[in-house]
Amino acid sequence: MRLYHGSNVIIDTINLAMCRPYKDFGKGFYLTDIKEQAEKMAVRVSTIYGGSPVVNVFEIEDDFKKIDDIKVKDFGLETTEEWATFVMNNRNRILTDVTNSLCNQDNKYDIVIGPVADDNMALLFRQYENEMIDFATLLKGMIYKKTSSQYSFHTEKSIKLLRKVEYYYG
C-alpha cells in the first residue's frame, strides 16, 4: 500500500521527536492513502512555513494490521462518537487520564487510522469544550462533514514498517 505525506521538505528519515503533540490521534507521523489530500497538505504547509510543496511517498505491507506486536486502532472512514471522543482527548492539552483507551497521548497505539478532523470540526470541538454546544450537537455537526483519511505512526517500531519510495514536488 502506498501512503503519502504532504510537506515543505523532503523526508529521508522520519524523526518522531520533530512531530507535534495534540494532533487528532496524538503526536506522530501522519500520512494518507489519498494522493490529492497529501498534495493539498503540501501546498498548505509550504504556504505557512515557506519552501516548496513536496509529497513524500512511502510503502507499507498491505497486511500490516495483522502484525502481532503492532497495536492498530482503526476507526474506518466514518466519523463516530468513539472517533470524536478520541480526537478531542488527543487534542486536549489538560487531559489527565492519558491511559484511557480513547486517547493516544501515551502512544498505546502504534498506528491509528481514521478520518481527518478538518478546521470546521476543530471549531465544533472548541464549542463543545467551551460548553457552547452539547455532545449530540457536536456529533450531528460532524456527521455531515466531508472526511478524508489519515494514518498516524506513533512508535519507532511502526515507523520501521514504512519504506520511502520517492518524492515529488507538487
Regions found by a protein language model. Give the residues of each.
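Short aromatic-glycine-(Arg/Gly/Cys) micro-motifs in beta-strand/loop hairpins
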Residues: 1-23
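Conserved NAD+-utilizing ADP-ribose enzyme module
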Residues: 23-24, 44-54, 60-170
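Short, flexible loop/turn elements at secondary-structure junctions
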Residues: 8, 35, 62-64
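Extended catalytic/binding region for NAD+/ADP-ribose chemistry, centered on the ART fold
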Residues: 20-45
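Short, conserved beta-strand segments within well-ordered enzyme catalytic domains
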Residues: 3-5, 30-31, 57-59
